């Protein structure tokens, strides 16, 4: 994608992103002397997001979903999450369901982005040959341009009541008939 190409051209390595139940992360390792350029490029991806590669990224996610169907560890983990967190969002697959991946709407993605990708929900972690006192002004200059918005209201879920012991079994893997 364009962001990866840009930061890799300045020496970044390990450019990646990932999502879990409660968070998304973006990671890259880059030379300390490129900090100003990295701050500008990274802040721009939130100031002026480009969803041009939406379809190709979606295809990557769908392919990841398909690969996960053959992964016994993932299948076991998903089974445990479904049973342990029944009725809670943690019971759902992080990557989504095929019906969500087959017919997504860009408008829904943008709506989600605008609701949740707000400064109050973001944390920037920098590690390496940098001094916080020297860099904090540049961080504020780059990311301080993000418009402050109230954090979205979060749904409150009831604590799961676990009473007694439950036992579930599942076959995972290849079992010939």
Residue ranges and their predicted role:
Residues 29-58, 136:
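M16/insulysin-pitrilysin zinc metalloprotease superfamily fold
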Residues 58, 106-142:
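Non-catalytic, conformational "gating/processing" segments within enzyme and secreted inhibitor domains
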Residues 32-35, 129-132, 176:
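Solvent-exposed loop/turn segments at secondary-structure junctions
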Residues 2-32, 67-121, 145-177:
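Non-catalytic beta-strand/loop surface segments
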Residues 44-51, 142-150:
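A common structural junction motif
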Residues 26, 42, 61, 109, ...:
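Divalent metal-coordination and catalytic microenvironments
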Residues 21, 59-60:
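Short, conserved phosphate-binding/catalytic loop or strand-edge motifs used
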């Amino acid at each position: 994608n364009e962001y990866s190409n840009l930061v890799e051209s300045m020496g970044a390595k390990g450019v990646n992103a990932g999502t879990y139940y409660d968070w998304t992360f973006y990671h890259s390792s880059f030379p300390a002397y490129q900090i100003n350029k990295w701050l500008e490029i990274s802040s721009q991806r939130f100031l002026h997001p480009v969803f041009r590669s939406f379809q190709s990224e979606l295809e990557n996610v769908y392919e990841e979903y398909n690969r996960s169907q053959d992964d016994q560890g993932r299948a076991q983990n998903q089974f445990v999450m479904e049973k342990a967190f029944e009725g809670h969002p943690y019971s759902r697959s992080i990557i989504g369901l095929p019906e969500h991946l087959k017919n997504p709407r860009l408008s829904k993605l943008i709506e989600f982005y605008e609701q949740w990708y707000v400064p109050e929900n973001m944390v920037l972690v920098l590690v390496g040959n940098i001094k916080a006192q020297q860099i904090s002004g540049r961080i504020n200059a780059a990311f301080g341009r993000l418009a402050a918005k109230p954090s979205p209201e979060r749904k409150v879920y009831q604590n799961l009541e676990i009473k007694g012991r439950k036992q579930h079994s599942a076959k995972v893997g290849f079992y010939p008939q």
